Amino acid sequence: MNKKTVPFTSEQLENIIAQYPTPFHIYDEEGIIENMKSFINAFSWNKGFKQYFAVKATPNPYIMRLLQKLGVGADCSSLAELLLCEKVGITGHDIMFTSNDTPYVEYKKALEMGAIINLDDITHIEYLEKNHGFLPDTFCVRYNPGSLKEGGNTIIGLPEEAKYGMTREQIFEAYKQLQAKGVKHFGIHTMVVSNELDIDGLVGTAELCFNLAVDIKKELGITVEFIDLGGGVGVAYKPEQTPVDFGVLSKGVEEAYNRILVANGLNDVALAYECGRMVTGPFGYLVSTAIHKKDIYRHYIGLDACMANLMRPALYGSYHHITVMGKENAPKDHVYDVTGSLCENNDKFAIQRELPKIDIGDRVIIHDAGAHGHSMGFNYNGKLRSAELLLHKDGSVTQIRRAETYDDLFGTLDFSNL
């Protein structure tokens, strides 16, 4: 069982709400730090191990700086994420730039910042050389194993159907071209799963990359210096799910590392992950208030939050656990659809969910909203994105992003010539 708790009491929460009205996202600073330390320590056996935080998960400079202090880098996929890194002070090889269908302006910024370029497309070698004039001495190449790897979901897709990465044949050709053009340092990357809780599946991804590195060494004489295993380490969204044990995962990867890489003379390959979801996801909460009850063919609880605050349930049908503050131990003897006010019928945080009796004014907490929550927010239907708060170990709170206003919403419109 995966007990779902909150890092504040009802009294603490009411004090926070007195200053910052609902809805808002709040992140548990201590939880993020301790979880990240645990992950990094699990892989301490690998001398060059690096975790790059997937900025897209929670693109907030406070979160990024928090992780930077732990030695965590940044996995960027867009110009905006690169600019965030620049403002935080994350540069050089502390950035892995993993993008696709990439405009040159984004490559240009990544190269100016000294980021490692993770090539998604073999044609981008020529594209970069033509537009930039020269290539850096370090490259990573994204591998799409196709039918060799099962899995995928609506986010990543089945490998053979996904738009990402290169085939095995293209990987070898890309390495030949890059070496001929003077590139000296090579890496492999793959990302074929998302929100994976099965450790065997995660280790299988590592084995896939390790075998590829061995084949590259044998066939091309090129030594792969680093292997980025992507993200994909999952979050146990449901109470009955078991979170990934970092120690068990690390042991599985280490066994494969020794069996495949070390056994073939590749003793010093640095490993990396670019996790985002598991870093902040379990330590973020969407705090809302029940403002309406409606009884027709079903029983509805209307919140002051909507899918503009958390899109995952509507977009993916994802489960997010719900706690009603002060009623944690009350019997779950009511069945509700928990909704927002968007003019879309899929604006539902829960469908036919067994919950305690909810009254108007109750504080409703939506769990595991720390990744791909606020960052996937939007303004459709004129909705405003909510504030982000950081809860410190001593119980104090820092607002790390203010709530949007209607002035923000209309700021790009020109009313002067109406």
Q: Which residues fall in each region the model found?
A:
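Conserved active-site and cofactor/substrate-binding residues in soluble primary-metabolism enzymes
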Residues: 8-11, 27-34, 58, 123, ...
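A charged N-terminal "starter" segment
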Residues: 1-137, 178-180, 184, 218, ...
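Glycine-rich, aromatic-flanked loop segments that form ligand/cofactor-binding clefts
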Residues: 134-148
